[in-house]
C-alpha cells in the first residue's frame, strides 16, 4: 500500500542504459520489479527516443501496456508525453526554430558526418522527431555488433564529443542545445527542451522527484535533469544497478 510519504514521491527513469541495456528490450524480471515498486510509489519514464522506440523496448510494441506500467510516460525528453493515458500537448522543433535554420543545421551535419572516417557506416544518419533531431555518425540502422564497435571507437577518438562541439560553436546562437545521446548519436533540441522539460508536469504534484540515469555527466542527455535542484539524482550503470538504487530509496520510504 502506498504511504502518504511515498504518494508525494515519484521515481523517474531514463530508459536506455537504465531500465534496459542500450537499445535492448526490458527483461521480464525488470518489468516485474517495476510493477511491484509501483505498488509502493508512483513511477515515470523520460527517454530521449521517440514513443515508438520506447514502446518497443519496454512493452513489446504495446502502447496500452506501456501506459499501464507508469503513472507518467515521457518520450523525446517529455515533448511527447502522457499522464496515465491522457496526452500532453506535443511540442515541435520545426515550429520552435523554423525550417530555414533546421535545413542549415541538417546540411552542415550531413557534410560533417560525410568526412568522418569510421570502421563502418550504415544508414539513417538524421532522424527527425517531434521535439529534436537525432544525428548518428554511424547511422541508426547499424547492427548491434556494429553499434558496439562504434561505442569502442567513440571512446578512443571522441567522435561525438567533437561533433557536439562543432555543432555548439556553429548553431548555439540559434537557441539550440546539443547532447550526447545513447550510444551512437547526438541530440539537438531547443534550449530548455532537455529532460528537465518533463518536470513542469511533475513538480506541482510531488515534493520529492528521484531521477535515475546513466548519462549524467556534463554533455550527457541525462545531465540537466540529474543536476536540477528539483530532483534527487542517481547515476546508474545499467538495469541491475538501477534496481539496487531503487531498493535503497524504497527502504528510506518505509
Swiss-Prot record:
Q: Could you list this entry's UniProt keywords, alphabetically sorted.
A: Cytoplasm, Isomerase, Magnesium, Metal-binding
Q: Origin, by domain of life?
A: Eukaryota
Question: Which Gene Ontology CC terms are recorded?
Answer: cytosol
Name of a matching Pfam family: PMM
Kindly list the positions annotated as binding Mg(2+) 2: 226, 228, 231
- Major place of residence: cytoplasm
Query: Which pathway does it operate in?
Result: Nucleotide-sugar biosynthesis; GDP-alpha-D-mannose biosynthesis; alpha-D-mannose 1-phosphate from D-fructose 6-phosphate: step 2/2
Q: Tell me the GO BP annotations in alphabetical order.
A: GDP-mannose biosynthetic process; IRE1-mediated unfolded protein response; mannose metabolic process; protein N-linked glycosylation
Q: Which reaction does it catalyse?
A: alpha-D-mannose 1-phosphate = D-mannose 6-phosphate
Which EC numbers does the record give?
5.4.2.8
Residue positions of the active site = 14, 16
Q: Which NCBIfam families match?
A: HAD-SF-IIB (TIGR01484)
Family label: Belongs to the eukaryotic PMM family.
UniProt protein name: Probable phosphomannomutase
Amino acid at each position: 500500500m502506498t504511504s502518504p510519504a511515498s504518494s508525494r514521491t515519484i521515481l523517474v527513469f531514463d530508459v536506455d542504459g537504465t531500465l534496459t541495456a542500450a537499445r535492448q528490450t526490458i527483461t521480464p524480471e525488470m518489468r516485474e520489479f517495476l510493477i511491484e515498486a509501483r505498488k509502493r510509489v508512483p513511477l515515470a519514464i523520460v527517454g530521449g527516443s521517440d514513443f515508438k522506440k520506447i514502446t518497443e523496448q519496454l512493452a513489446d510494441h504495446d502502447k496500452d501496456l506501456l501506459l499501464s506500467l507508469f503513472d507518467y510516460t515521457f518520450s523525446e525528453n517529455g515533448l511527447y508525453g502522457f499522464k496515465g493515458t491522457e496526452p500532453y500537448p506535443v511540442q515541435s522543433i520545426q515550429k520552435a526554430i523554423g525550417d530555414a535554420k533546421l535545413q542549415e543545421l541538417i546540411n552542415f551535419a550531413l557534410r560533417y558526418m560525410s568526412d568522418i572516417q569510421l570502421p563502418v557506416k550504415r544508414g539513417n544518419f538524421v532522424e527527425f522527431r517531434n521535439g529534436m533531431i537525432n544525428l548518428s555518425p554511424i547511422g541508426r540502422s547499424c547492427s548491434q555488433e556494429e553499434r558496439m564497435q562504434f561505442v569502442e571507437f567513440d571512446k578512443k577518438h571522441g567522435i561525438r564529443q567533437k561533433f557536439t562541439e562543432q555543432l555548439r560553436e556553429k548553431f548555439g546562437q540559434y537557441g539550440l542545445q546539443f547532447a550526447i545521446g545513447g550510444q551512437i548519436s547526438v541530440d539537438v533540441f531547443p534550449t530548455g527542451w532537455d529532460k528537465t522539460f518533463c518536470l513542469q508536469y511533475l513538480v506541482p504534484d510531488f515534493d520529492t522527484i528521484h531521477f535515475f540515469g546513466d548519462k549524467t555527466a556534463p554533455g550527457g542527455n541525462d545531465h540537466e535533469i540529474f543536476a536540477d535542484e528539483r530532483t534527487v539524482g542517481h547515476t546508474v550503470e545499467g538495469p541491475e544497478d538501477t534496481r539496487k538504487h531503487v531498493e535503497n530509496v524504497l527502504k528510506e520510504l518505509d
